[in-house]
């Protein structure tokens, strides 16, 4: 098995088109552009169907990296996995997290335990009528397994976060399916985001053995007892396939980072966030074990679909001015930021089948100096 070293760099941005921080790190030699495998980002759009800050950010990054790699911007987008999550409500701060990977001859002497590893895979392009249905679940499950192999992770227990970028429906895509005599899961562009996120998350659950493979189309957005504890899915208009990024710990990794996770049972589950921090030797800011430093936190958030949090009614689902996903990102983002001591954390809205209903997974990456 090959040995790899993974790097993780959190870079603040002044806007969705800001690449100055990344270019500065490349210029200083801190980041080798040829080693960049994935970029996860938070952009200050609305996180909805018409949030073009995600596409803008990807275009800016691809244009900036193209001459560094000797590729066209289109080729850069095929080479690197870009996952932009729109919506930095409340105290959430726009930023990108750059993951690099390079092969090394062996693990350094004295390096103990499993360390952070990353793997990537893509599904095929989906037909509009396949989104939110069994085909998307099955293809995603296969891609998760491929990404695990790419990361050198064999045991599902070592997988702590699976980030997926998935497609959504537009009126043109719905019409294309109809012209072929097929119906889509929904005709609502906004509603399709939930279907696509949910089916993708169930694909993760199937791949990791968190649920059986006998999931039907009717289970998506209905059987909320079926979920993955590590899936994080974000829908966007800019693609028609799923991009799958697996983050976990591997004995084949020589990185100076470690990842752990917990599952929030609801939007105010501070204990779960604290548990995730403790998994990697961290505590509520500024507490940490010697030789441990927080790099970033990744979490999912959603308004509880039953309309209540711990028995008290919430109004996030009834607000016609602000979507429930924006409410949830702001609430969970504030909670995590308070515990982490920073608003530059990755909190994504819409957690269908990603953790229990109303909750969601939370993962923490720490840098180890030992």
Swiss-Prot record:
Pathway: Xenobiotic degradation; atrazine degradation; biuret from cyanurate: step 1/1. Mg(2+) binds at residues 302, 351, 354-356, 359. The record marks 325 as: Important for substrate specificity. It comes from the Bacteria. The keyword Glycoprotein does not apply. It catalyses: cyanurate + H2O = 1-carboxybiuret + H(+). GO terms for biological process: atrazine catabolic process. The keyword Magnesium applies. Pfam families: Amido_AtzD_TrzD. Inhibited by barbituric acid. The active site is at residues 165, 234. Residues 115-251 are annotated as: RU B. GO terms for molecular function: cyanuric acid amidohydrolase activity; metal ion binding. Residues 257-370 are annotated as: RU C. Substrate binds at residues 54, 85-86, 197, 234-235, 329, 348-349. InterPro entries: AtzD/Barbiturase, AtzD/Barbiturase_RUA, AtzD/Barbiturase_RUB, AtzD/Barbiturase_RUC. Residues 1-106 are annotated as: RU A. Its EC number is 3.5.2.15. Keywords: Hydrolase, Magnesium, Metal-binding. Belongs to the cyclic amide hydrolase (CyAH) family. Homotetramer. Responsible for the hydrolysis of cyanuric acid, an intermediate formed during catabolism of s-triazine based compounds in herbicides such as atrazine and polymers such as melamine. Catalyzes the hydrolytic opening of the s-triazine ring of cyanuric acid (2,4,6-trihydroxy-s-triazine) to yield carbon dioxide and carboxybiuret, which spontaneously decarboxylates to biuret. The monomer structure is formed from three repeating units (RUs) that share the same structure as one another. The monomer, the active site and substrate all possess threefold rotational symmetry, to the extent that the active site possesses three potential Ser-Lys catalytic dyads. It is possible that any or all of the three active-site serines may act as nucleophile (albeit only one can do so per catalytic cycle). This is Cyanuric acid amidohydrolase.
């Amino acid at each position: 098995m090959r040995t790899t070293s993974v790097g993780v760099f959190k870079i603040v941005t002044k806007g969705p088109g800001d690449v100055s921080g990344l270019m500065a790190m490349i210029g200083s030699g801190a980041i080798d552009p040829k080693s960049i495998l994935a970029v996860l980002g938070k952009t200050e759009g609305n996180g909805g169907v018409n949030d073009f800050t995600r596409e803008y950010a990807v275009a800016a990054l691809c244009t900036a990296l193209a001459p560094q790699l000797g590729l066209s911007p289109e080729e850069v987008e095929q080479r690197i996995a870009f996952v932009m999550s729109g919506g930095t409500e409340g105290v959430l701060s726009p930023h990108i997290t750059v993951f690099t990977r390079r092969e090394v001859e062996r693990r350094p002497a004295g390096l103990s335990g499993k360390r952070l590893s990353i793997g990537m895979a893509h599904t095929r392009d989906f037909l509009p009528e396949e989104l939110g249905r069994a085909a998307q679940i099955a293809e995603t499950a296969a891609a998760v397994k491929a990404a695990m192999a790419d990361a050198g992770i064999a045991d599902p227990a070592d997988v702590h976060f699976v980030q997926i970028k998935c497609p959504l429906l537009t009126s043109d895509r719905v019409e294309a399916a109809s012209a072929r005599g097929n119906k889509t899961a929904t005709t609502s562009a906004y509603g399709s985001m939930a279907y696509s996120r949910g089916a993708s998350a169930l694909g993760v659950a199937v791949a990791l053995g968190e649920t059986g493979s006998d999931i039907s189309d009717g289970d998506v957005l209905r059987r909320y007892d079926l979920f993955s504890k590590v899936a994080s899915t974000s829908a966007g208009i800019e693609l028609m396939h799923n991009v799958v990024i697996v983050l976990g710990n591997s004995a084949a990794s020589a990185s100076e980072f470690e990842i752990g996770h917990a599952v929030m049972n609801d939007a105010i589950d501070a204990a779960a966030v604290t548990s995730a921090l403790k998994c990697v030797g961290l505590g509520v800011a500024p507490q940490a074990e010697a030789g441990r430093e927080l790099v970033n936190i990744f979490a999912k958030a959603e308004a509880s679909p039953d309309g209540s949090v711990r028995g008290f009614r919430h109004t996030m689902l009834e607000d016609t001015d602000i979507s429930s996903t924006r409410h949830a990102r702001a609430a969970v983002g504030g909670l995590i930021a308070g515990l982490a001591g920073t608003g530059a954390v990755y909190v994504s809205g819409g957690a269908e089948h990603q953790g229990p209903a109303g909750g969601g997974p939370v993962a923490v990456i720490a840098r180890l100096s030992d």
